[in-house]
Amino acid sequence: MLQANGNELYVERRGSGEPLLLIQGMTGHSLHWGEPLLAALERDFELVLYDHRGVGRSAASDQPFTIADLAADALAVLDGLGIDGAHVLGISMGGMVAQELALAAPERVRTLTLGATYCGGDGARFTDETVVNALAAAILSGDPERKIRTGWEFNVSPRFATAEGNLERFSQVADQYPITLGMVIAQVQAIMGHDTSERLAQISMPTLVVHGSADQILVASNGELVAGLIPGARLELLDGVGHLFFWEQPERVAQLVAEHAVAARA
């Protein structure tokens, strides 16, 4: 555990190589990366995993926060571990946190990989209302199985959602350390206040933007917008893949992140 801005955060390190800070999305904790992705990434990096305040194995928290506050937590993780600079991979809400981290402390971010994320502002598209309503109804139903199943169906492609064993493997992760309704609301409020659209031009480190073309949570035009606003950013669209693209194509994602780091050193 590590103290970060008055919050006690769960932190884990695994693998060897240059450090890669992984920043999870809304409701996600460090197990939500999935073992296939982590095993692939640790062939090239020392992975720095942590759980957001009030989530997973981190201590409970009842204070409101912004995405910038979560970025300050991420920076505190690097400080607490004595890491001067790291490659950064942020997914969904974690991609928003990574944007703020790159803007606040660019000297600490060697490369930036933003996955399935959103910058706010003109042109950005938040989650469709019908999807939000379906997810909210599942969360409020009090039925854990319905909540996991509904979230799964909206977060991955239909083909992957129905393939044998995939939901069961995800459920084994999602059943652990369930998030409170209060923290879900706090994260939604933080996301709704997120807007880096007019500041992304300040990002100067090598940036890769990855998005699934079949993302139902944050449609792919969001990735196109983010990549277009960051000077020199490269966009990688994964065809037919949903929001949790790193569950659907873990080896490909690990390859993209590793190649991005190698290219930055060239």
Regions found by a protein language model. Give the residues of each.
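Flexible "cap/lid" loop of the alpha/beta hydrolase fold
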Residues: 99, 103, 110-141
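Catalytic active-site module of serine/aspartate enzymes centered on a nucleophile-bearing elbow/loop
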Residues: 233-266
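Conserved HGGG/HGGXW glycine-rich cap/lid loop of the alpha/beta-hydrolase fold
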Residues: 4-59
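Short beta-strand/loop motif that positions the catalytic acidic residue
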Residues: 203, 209-211
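Active-site loop/oxyanion-hole signature of alpha/beta-hydrolase fold enzymes
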Residues: 48-49, 53-89, 255
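Gly/Ala-rich beta-loop-alpha elbow adjacent to hydrolase catalytic centers
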Residues: 90, 94, 98
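Conserved alpha/beta-hydrolase catalytic His-Asp/Glu region
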Residues: 144-192, 198-199
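Acidic catalytic loop of the alpha/beta-hydrolase fold
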Residues: 214-218
